[in-house]
Structure formats: structure tokens, C-alpha cells
Amino acid sequence: MPEGHTLHRLARLHQRRFAGAPVSVSSPQGRFADSASALNGRVLRRASAWGKHLFHHYVGGPVVHVHLGLYGTFTEWARPTDGWLPEPAGQVRMRMVGAEFGTDLRGPTVCESIDDGEVADVVARLGPDPLRSDANPSSAWSRITKSRRPIGALLMDQTVIAGVGNVYRNELLFRHRIDPQRPGRGIGEPEFDAAWNDLVSLMKVGLRRGKIIVVRPEHDHGLPSYLPDRPRTYVYRRAGEPCRVCGGVIRTALLEGRNVFWCPVCQT
């Protein structure tokens, strides 16, 4: 599932390509047809993201709410200069076409037209988003410090922190030497503050670069991060391999239905 930085990149891209002008909206698949018809020809006011949720705000009130889930994708394309649009390929839930660019949405968990009040309801269920300037980490800390749930599970709970997925979860805990099974109430406030600030920095890098980069230079053999063979993670999907820091064996287990990865030597 795409993590939060991906949705913020999409919001920035769609803001740049479509905002401020009328947009043609359709639903070749048909499942979004009624809403698409009501949106067609409206001006996109802005695009925004909160965690793993994308919002397209149109002049006049309607907001398209998208959650990609496990399988959703946007395919971006440049509008041909001859005026002919490409035929939709596959099950396109929503197609947006602007003056110079188009995008096709396939396979989302959610694609719906809602109003501002319903947007507020969605956001009210979410924790702070590290990529938003209005993020309030104290609300996440207040939930974590009272919880007996493992910190590895709490980080994936979108009501605690919005936008963190399995890669950032595993890598953040490794970088701060925290066992994913440790109860939330066993996390000290200085540990939380350091991890939050690190998460903000890591996700900003992901937003800027378009990929998750978490390995520190001292563990990366001095290679620049754009090399194709660069080690991209410390523990994620590295079960049975040696730890990049201590040489111990990376372990994996299920934690509330999701795979968690950690180094039993480095993380306590």
C-alpha cells in the first residue's frame, strides 16, 4: 500500500497540472459515473493529502476523496497535441483531463464525491500527518503513552499517526533501536520526540525524491542514494539476512496481521 509521501506527491502533481482550470471528469468503468457527471467541467480549486487520503477540492463545493488501498494507482499522461485522447486501458474508475495532462485512476479502495463536512469527518478519524505543517505530534504521544499495544502496531494505526506504512514503521523503529513488540506506554517521551522528528525528515525525503530512503550514509558504504544497487532498507523484507549494523540475523513475525521486521540485537 502506498505510504503517505506518495499521496502528498500526487497532491502536488495534481495541483500543478490541474488546479485553477476546468477539468473533464469521467468514469470509463462506470462505477463513479454519476459523481463524475456532476464534476465534469468544474474548476479544480486545489489538491491536498492527509495521511493516505487524497482530496480534490472543486469550486462550488464537491470534493473527490480517494484512498488507493492495496491496489489503487494513478497513471499520469500528457495530452496528445492532435486532440485525440488515449483509450482507457483496464478498469478506469475516474479519468481527469486538463489542458495539457490527464490521469487515470484504477483499483482504489475509495473513490467518492463528498462535501466539506464529510471531509472533516474523515480527517477527524486520522492522527497527525508528519508531512503537514499543522501536524500536532502531542496527540499521537498522548495515545501511545497510554497504550499497552505494541509500538509496532500503534505506528500502523492511522488514528495514531496518519501516513505511516509498513516500510516506514519497520525502518523507524530500527533507526531508534526500539523493539516493535515494546508496549506504547514503555516508550519514553524523549524517544518519541526523536522518532517523530526523524519520521518527519524521512518522509520529507520520500516526498522530494519519490522513494523511501532510510539507510544512513555510514551504513551505506558512502554510495550516493541514486545508485540502483543502493541498500534501501535496514530490516524491511530482509528476514534471515545480516544486520547492516551489527551483523546479527534479521527476524520477522506477524504483528496484528502485518509482517514486522527487526534486529533482536540492535532493538530492545
From Swiss-Prot:
Cofactor note text: Binds 1 zinc ion per subunit.
Positions of the catalytic residues: 2-3, 52, 258
PROSITE patterns according to UniProt: ZF_FPG_1 (PS01242), ZF_FPG_2 (PS51066)
Top-level taxon in the UniProt lineage: Bacteria
Zinc finger (FPG-type): 234-268
Gene3D superfamilies named in the record: 1.10.8.50, MutM-like, N-terminal (3.20.190.10)
Keyword annotations of the record: DNA damage, DNA repair, DNA-binding, Glycosidase, Hydrolase, Lyase, Metal-binding, Multifunctional enzyme, Zinc, Zinc-finger
Residues involved in DNA binding: 125, 166
Cofactor(s) in the UniProt record: Zn(2+)
UniProt-listed Enzyme Commission number(s): 3.2.2.-, 4.2.99.18
Induction section of the entry: Expressed in mid-log phase.
Gene Ontology biological process terms from the UniProt entry: base-excision repair; cellular response to oxidative stress; DNA repair; nucleotide-excision repair; response to oxidative stress
Recorded GO MF terms: class I DNA-(apurinic or apyrimidinic site) endonuclease activity; damaged DNA binding; DNA-(apurinic or apyrimidinic site) endonuclease activity; double-stranded DNA binding; oxidized purine nucleobase lesion DNA N-glycosylase activity; oxidized pyrimidine nucleobase lesion DNA N-glycosylase activity; single-stranded DNA binding; uracil DNA N-glycosylase activity
Cysteine-cysteine disulfides: none
Pfam family, one: Fapy_DNA_glyco
Keyword Cell membrane: no
Catalysed conversion reaction: 2'-deoxyribonucleotide-(2'-deoxyribose 5'-phosphate)-2'-deoxyribonucleotide-DNA = a 3'-end 2'-deoxyribonucleotide-(2,3-dehydro-2,3-deoxyribose 5'-phosphate)-DNA + a 5'-end 5'-phospho-2'-deoxyribonucleoside-DNA + H(+)
Function description: Involved in base excision repair of DNA damaged by oxidation or by mutagenic agents. DNA glycosylase that recognizes and removes damaged pyrimidines. Excises Tg:A (thymine glycol, prefers 5R isomers), Tg:G, 5,6-dihydrouracil:G base pairs and urea:A, also excises oxidized purine derivatives guanidinohydantoin:C and spiroiminodihydantoin:C. Poorly cleaves dsDNA with uracil substitutions, thus also acting as a weak uracil-DNA glycosylase. Acts on DNA bubble and 3'-fork structures, suggesting a role in replication-associated DNA repair.
Family, as annotated: Belongs to the FPG family.
Protein's UniProt name: Endonuclease 8 1
Phylogenetic placement of the source organism: Bacteria, Bacillati, Actinomycetota, Actinomycetes, Mycobacteriales
Name of encoding gene: nei1
